[in-house]
Structures are given as C-alpha cells and as structure tokens.
C-alpha cells in the first residue's frame, strides 16, 4: 500500500484511504510518512453491533483506538462512517455524537447490492424504523452551525428516499467526474452497479482513448438511467 500511495502522492492533490482501522500501527506509520492523506474508518455501530456485523471480536475497539491516535497526532483529514441497515440503525445517532465529540467527519451510506461484492440479498426490512433513525440524524445535523453538515442532512434525506425506492435527490456523477479502477485495470463508473459496467482497460488503452471511447459513452448512458 505504501508504494501505491507514494506514486499517487506525486500526482494527486488528495488521497483518501478507507479501512476498518484494525491494524493501528500500520495506519499510523502510513500517516507519519504521508501526513496529507485522508483516513476514513468504517465502523458499523457501537461495540457489540460492529463486531457482530464485521465478524471481528475486537473490531470496534481497534478501529476506535486508531481514530483516537490519529486525533492525538493531529492528523488533518480523519473521519469515519457507517453503512446503515436494520441491525445497526439504532446506533446511528450515537456514532454521529461520537464523531462530533472527536471533531471528525461522519459519512453514511445505505445497505445495497453490487456485482463487485457478489451480493444480491442486502435488503432493509424495517424501512420505517431505519427512516426514523435517519430523520433523527438529520435533526442533529441541522442543529449544527456548519453549512457542510446541513448539506449532509440533505444527503441523508436522500437516503430515506433511496430506501423507499423513490427517485434520488442528487444526480450521480460517476463516469462523468469520478470513476473506479479494479486491480486488473478495468475502469468502471463505480463498484455499486448491479452488473459490471466496463468503460475500458488501462492495460490496453491510453486514458484519453478510454475516457472518450464509444464504450465509455454507453456506460455513461447506463449511469444516467441508474436507479441506485
């Protein structure tokens, strides 16, 4: 990972790494060498809930310990987030409060299915309960004096729409402003689509050729009509 970051560091203004935070020492060493990288730690609830979902007995404590150490060393770009589902929705506001106390960013996502994770059975069953927990979070965010948190409130309002199968509030810019590259060089709009949508492969094409190709335009059309 260090070698990859070292190369990207030369070319990118911002690098953010998502992790479960389990290997604290490795993450700290990485941040010491690259002080401007962002770290986002995925925590799926309070201790019991997180450990059950993640299948790691000490997962919450390890992730939380990593967060605290990064704060103590005054790392400038730290945050955490959770993917909300029936099992952890009740912990949503508690985790937000925890992030607030530590002065961190708090990101949310909703449970979903994807070809990339070979999963098609992720379903939120108690939608009213989960929606209410999102509503509680929205009210908390709107109490803040931070405009960024007001925008996060709007985003979370959009997640309520999403879990009820309604039209998304914000347009998706995947394949237009952002993209996903898998380890084999395939460039895709994201890793959250139902089927694999490949714009091209960097081992076989130059970036300009790939990005401006007919195949890429076909994928963008798929994104325009994506209901996810």
Regions found by a protein language model. Give the residues of each.
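His/Asp/Glu-rich metal-coordinating catalytic cores
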Residues: 27
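Short beta->alpha connector loops
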Residues: 19-24, 84-88
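Residue-level signal for short amphipathic helical patches enriched in basic/charged
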Residues: 18, 87, 154, 202, ...
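Glycine/alanine-rich phosphate-binding loops at beta-alpha junctions
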Residues: 1
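Conserved phosphate-coordination/catalytic loops
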Residues: 21, 57-61, 213
């Amino acid at each position: 990972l260090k070698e990859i970051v070292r190369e990207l560091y030369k070319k990118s203004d911002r690098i953010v790494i998502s992790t479960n935070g389990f290997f604290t020492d490795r993450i700290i060493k990485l941040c010491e060498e690259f002080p401007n990288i962002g770290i986002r730690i995925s925590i799926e609830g309070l201790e019991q809930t997180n450990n059950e979902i993640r299948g790691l007995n000490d997962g919450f404590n390890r992730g939380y310990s990593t967060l605290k150490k990064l704060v103590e060393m005054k790392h400038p770009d730290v945050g955490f987030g959770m993917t909300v589902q029936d099992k952890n929705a009740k912990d949503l506001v508690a985790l937000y409060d925890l992030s607030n106390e530590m002065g961190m960013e708090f990101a949310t996502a909703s449970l979903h299915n994807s070809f990339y994770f070979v999963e098609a059975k992720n379903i939120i069953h108690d939608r009213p309960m989960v929606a209410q927990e999102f509503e509680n979070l929205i009210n908390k965010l709107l109490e803040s004096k931070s405009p960024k948190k007001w925008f996060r409130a709007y985003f979370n309002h959009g997640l309520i729409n999403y879990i009820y199968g309604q039209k998304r509030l914000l347009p998706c810019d995947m394949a237009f402003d952002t993209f996903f590259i898998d380890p084999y060089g395939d460039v895709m709009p994201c890793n959250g689509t139902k089927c694999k949508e490949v714009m091209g492969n960097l081992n076989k094409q130059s970036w300009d050729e790939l990005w401006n190709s007919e195949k890429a335009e076909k994928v963008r059309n798929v994104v325009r009509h994506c209901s996810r």
